[in-house]
Amino acid sequence: MDTKTLIASEIAKVVPELEQDAIFNLLETPKNSDMGDLAFPAFSLAKVLRKAPQMIASELAEQIDESQFEKVVAVGPYINFFLDKTKISSQVLEQVITAGSDYAQQDEGQGRNVAIDMSSPNIAKPFSIGHLRSTVIGDSLAHIFAKMGYKPVKINHLGDWGKQFGMLIVAYKKWGDEAAVQAHPIDELLKLYVRINAEAETDPTVDEEAREWFRKLEDGDKEATELWQWFRDESLLEFNRLYDQLHVTFDSYNGEAFYNDKMDEVLDLLEAKNLLVESKGAQVVNLEKYGIEHPALIKKSDGATLYITRDLAAALYRKRTYDFAKSVYVVGNEQAAHFKQLKAVLKEMGYDWSDDMTHVAFGLVTKGGAKLSTRKGNVILLEPTVAEAINRAASQIEAKNPNLADKEAVAHSVGVGAIKFYDLKTDRMNGYDFDLEAMVSFEGETGPYVQYAHARIQSILRKADFTPSATTTYSLADAESWEIIKLIQDFPRIIKRTSDNFEPSIMAKFAINLAQSFNKYYAHTRILDDNSERDNRLALCYATATVLKEALRLLGVDAPNEM
């Protein structure tokens, strides 16, 4: 039982007026540790008990069983709990040493599937930093859901269909050089894409030609289909090379084109349920009863289907295929209205499982404050950026530890980890400005800072030749170690909060706090001094390294043993 639950249960015994869960949610952490480890504000009981909060706190403090705590005292309207540091540190260290990386593993999911729609770059366009957010947030959530006992199903819903392929075919037919495209497929295709869009701004016939080629593609025209397949194959080769660098894998690459033959069923279902309404020649579903002003446009007046029709088909396919407990879409916040419509249409169709679908939105990445745009050629391409991050990491490692073995592998872990961590430490609804120098810094709230704290602990453990024993009782009671113990004890709750809120930044901030607390401990404590506390301190180091490594793993970041 964690300490918050313990305190809530003890208060509940003497306060029948409040449920234990309500008490748990009211508990606060005092700003000053001299005021205790946790505090219960008595204000919430003033109306019920018709007494002043100060009096309630004083009376309840006397009734609470103190045997589980160092002491329980009333201070004004608060009941302050001082935890038994020796007892709790012993319990926490034993749990981590016994479980290892399985510490804080939970069984909420009971093996049920979670479908995660993530990454989903557009075919024939470069994989940019803009796609990175969806990729790393989705990958981290997959690790988190697995830690909660779910089975994640990672789906790369590739953007492999649409009018842009008409544009690309027009561009390739006008200016394409087969040898150049084969040599540098994505670079050449990007140049063609930017050039044709620039021409389309002044020449309206370009759009008409593109629409015609896309119609041919939809009708299965041989030349159009072969070009489309070639663009898709070349793009996937490049994407998979990048995913390998990021250590990200997928369970499905079913993209937009996969659902081409599955949309008629959606239209038939909507028709059968009398949900389609004609509006200016188009087919729509009215969603006003869900507070959604604009109807969902299902089919345009020219008979063309839209993204939402395809996404309805995908949602049905995923439910039938995976029978998901949750289905999450890691997609930018600009698509919020689309996903509200998607859920509402499914609800109208009678599918209550639409309640299990969540749009995990996120903010934009900017560069120098400016929005990124593939169409305008204003992009930060991931491949050269990763290479530069690895080079910067290698330079710092060379300066700190020139004799390090396997420098290249460590530099890769640090460089890639730096980019991922910087993204994930940002609350996902907030955007951030891309700053590679800040990302790869070993100072501040960065991935390399956390990785270096882990490597430092491993160095201490190697120097001491220490491996903890599961049969030995370790305990500590000093203030610096107590801060670390409290964080380690909180790890299961941090995982749960990260999962419940679909918010990896909670985990990233926890990792920063734990690394900072250890570095403070390291600065104030002579860990390797040969006295009666040495093994206790080393057991704390071992537990801290175990949890730091696991926190980083849940973010999709490596934890090198040496740096």
Swiss-Prot record:
Disulfide bond in keyword set:
no
One Pfam family from the UniProt entry? Answer: Arg_tRNA_synt_N
- What GO biological process term is on the record, naming one? arginyl-tRNA aminoacylation
Q: What is its EC number?
A: 6.1.1.19
Q: Name one GO molecular function term.
A: arginine-tRNA ligase activity
Residue interval(s) of motif 'HIGH' region: 121-131
Has keyword Iron-sulfur? no
Q: Which InterPro entries match?
A: Arg-tRNA-ligase, Arg-tRNA-synth_N, Arg-tRNA-synth_N_sf, ArgRS_core, DALR_anticod-bd, Rossmann-like_a/b/a_fold, tRNAsynth_Ia_anticodon-bd
Localization per Swiss-Prot or TrEMBL: Cytoplasm
Cross-referenced HAMAP family = Arg_tRNA_synth
Q: Which proteins does it associate with, and in what oligomeric form?
A: Monomer.
Protein name (record): Arginine--tRNA ligase
Species name for this entry?
Streptococcus pyogenes serotype M2 (strain MGAS10270)
